[in-house]
């Protein structure tokens, strides 16, 4: 097994959720405080999302900042923030510059973790993002945005627990189409844009 910067990077993705070491570690975690959060390579985060996030596809955005949540070098989840692809969005850009508004694009954790692990993970990542986003983009992040996909059974409870505010709702963004194309390229079979909620969180409050 290869370890780089304390991360076991070659645990087989195809069976990592059922890997003996993973199962043993998950069973040993009784509180989120046993876990650590650290910045990770976007390639690692993308591979995780391809295998374990419900959308089953990689992100192709040039400027991302990604974090993983770990115990004993094993990754139990990732969160990915990206530079927004839109140049304006009423009430968000303006007044802010797009570079000040990172979008929370992916959040994925394994099952069986203690209650409130995702909230713990997000809160840690938000604090780290203030420094790491500026290093990546040159901008100080002011607001985090994220889309909650109602068509996939999500209701926004995690966002509300993290003090996000509902900004708007409707057929926002691209089709969900888990496992398939989601843009206008490549013959996307799902042309219907899903009902979503855009949530925003002001940083530095």
Q: Where do the PLM segments sit?
A:
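Acyl-donor binding region in acyl/amide transferases
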Residues: 36-39, 63, 82-193, 198
